[in-house]
Amino acid sequence: MEKDTELHCSFCGKEQKHVSKLIAGTSGYICNECIELCHDMLLSDAVETPEVESTEQQKLPTPHEIRAHLDDYVIGQDYAKKVLSVAVYNHYKRLRSDKQITDVELGKSNILLIGPTGSGKTLLAETMARMLNVPFAMADATTLTEAGYVGEDVENVLQKLVQSCDYDVERAEQGIIYIDEIDKITRKSENPSITRDVSGEGVQQALLKLIEGTVASIPPQGGRKHPQQEMLRVDTSKILFICGGAFAGLDKVIEKRVHVGSGIGFSAEVKSKQDKATLSQLFEQVEPDDLMKFGLIPEFIGRLPVVAPLAELDEEALVKILTEPKNALIKQYQALFSLEDVALEFSPEALTAMAKKALARKTGARGLRSIVEAILLDTMYDLPSLQHLEKVIVEASTITDNQPPTLVYKA
């Protein structure tokens, strides 16, 4: 009878007197030996599971490889791609060489992208981060204000980066932050003002420390539950900052300095006709003094040593953007239509008409999606309900005269 009532492990069957510990559950018992065995099994599984390589363990692509990857997704902007490829390579090479080089401190190569709206500034930064497999966060400079004022604090930019990698601080410190519309936070005049400029020069001052490198404190995941809770400490000296802006009017500042097309009377008229043709050439000649005249403070310019100018996209480039990149707009919509077993075709004239429309709107590549979406809206609305539809053909008249696309049905 005593044997029947003796407690034993439900897994191995050993009696209580033969083990050190027997833990009770809702419908059985488990001994310390079985717990240790399970622990060892779980531990061995964890060791066998391959870990995701950290940024430092991954092979760093060369500038040529970075450029080739950018070519797959971004049309044109050859000069900007070369500048970016070298700057990004040097930045991550610096991070990896910190442990090897002790006698020389390598400077940080933050980047300033200058180019018209829709020329590919944001796309370049996003593509770069995706290729390098590093955390990426984007912020709009126009929403930022100094701490204590209505608006978004500059530290929130850092919070977005840490959130993008599930609060893994070490991984976040290898990331890229892109700040758009940086030209909108220029100070209102060249002379320092005695009044507070919380959304212009004030934001530049607030961004300075983050960009040059500091140890910033941000709230932990879910925010601080009580005042004593520790904040997360993030070293921004390893984070690559890329700032971008259209800098409308900067070309006039550069033009004035280099005396391109300067003159009066008839020569002034010739100059105005050549403005668009020389925009990228002028941006390539930009100097720190030009940016100061535009409204960036000297300290801020000094933290962005690498300047990559982008050219205004012409009609030919916009047509290529529609069709050539790996994730080209036309390819995306063709894939959508293929899910309904329908082919989607665009005539060469239709592509040209869309490019011309985007140029007229002055939206660059950014405006192409809204144009394609508008001309295909009615067709996509009816598509799931149309029986035996085989092909949809978009002609130039669909864009220029608002004619519906041609629908071809199976015989």
Swiss-Prot record:
It holds the Pfam family zf-C4_ClpX. One of its GO terms (molecular function) is ATP-dependent protein folding chaperone. InterPro entries: AAA+_ATPase, ATP-dep_Clp_protease_ClpX, ATPase_AAA_core, Clp_ATPase_C, Clp_protease_ATP-bd_su_ClpX, ClpX_bact, P-loop_NTPase, Znf_CppX_C4. GO terms for cellular component: HslUV protease complex. Keywords: ATP-binding, Chaperone, Metal-binding, Nucleotide-binding, Zinc. PROSITE patterns: CLPX_ZB (PS51902). ATP binds at P116, T117, G118, S119, G120, K121, T122, L123. The keyword Nucleotide-binding applies. Residues 1-50 form the ClpX-type ZB domain. SMART domains: AAA (SM00382), ClpB_D2-small (SM01086), zf-C4_ClpX (SM00994). One of its GO terms (biological process) is cell division. Component of the ClpX-ClpP complex. Forms a hexameric ring that, in the presence of ATP, binds to fourteen ClpP subunits assembled into a disk-like structure with a central cavity, resembling the structure of eukaryotic proteasomes. NCBIfam families: clpX, PRK05342.1. ATP-dependent specificity component of the Clp protease. It directs the protease to specific substrates. Can perform chaperone functions in the absence of ClpP. This is ATP-dependent Clp protease ATP-binding subunit ClpX. It comes from Pasteurella multocida (strain Pm70). The gene is clpX.
